[in-house]
Amino acid sequence: LATHALTGHRVAVKIINKHKISSMDIGGRIKREIQFLRMLRHPHIIKLYEVIATPSDIIMVLEYAGGELFQYIVDHGRLPESEARRFFQQIITATNYCHKHKVAHRDLKPENLLLDEFLNIKVGDFGLSNLMGDGDFLKTSCGSPNYAAPEVIAGRLYSGPEVDVWSCGVILYVMLCGRLPFDDDYVPSLFVKISKGIYSLPSHLSPEAKDLLSSMLVVDPVKRITIPDIMQLPWFNVDLPAYLRPYPLTPSVEDKQFVLHRAPVMD
């Protein structure tokens, strides 16, 4: 944590030792994260302000977000539907923005969804992300097993957006239910549950939430709902802030709207 001398804004400083990068073979991951964070500008994606290279380290100066959705759920348990929907709206619109810029995140989970002081989502950790080319398919198995789509754990080809939809479905389930839909201490058993889509929907969920989860956690990626279709659902649009409604935004307009919603920015 640091403070920008001219603006007084708090920033996060991430220092990565070059020797550690080399020894752990994570150079590609660091380069991808820097590449995508430089490219993406959205109110609910963590901002990268500066990258400084020294002889020994790579220093990333990032927007400060002191919390994370994972800890918030641990502290609060299952969330009221209205609160879960607010987080979900921010996650989905940020993910949709990534997809429009041909970026598949591939590691969406509560631990990678940071929270600022006003409880706004900031999607982070783009180290496993990848660029999607038209007609191209990915095969790399990425992400955390509990949040990974069936086609990912099976090693099948996938285009990208559909695996993020599955992960967002798991995240929504966790927010609404306070537990994972697919969980097992024995990884092979976990993979069977995921590959067969074996999970239950608690009775306390609204019919609309059940329908949405059922359309996101579909084993066949071709039949899985898409993010543009999610954004058309009445449930998704309840109390949707104007700045998240789907229309083209330039970075300058985004930043202005960002200020209006009390999220910290840095000139």
Spans of features found by a protein language model:
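Eukaryotic serine/threonine protein kinase catalytic domain
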Residues: L1-Y243
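Regulatory extensions appended to serine/threonine kinase catalytic cores
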Residues: Y243-D267
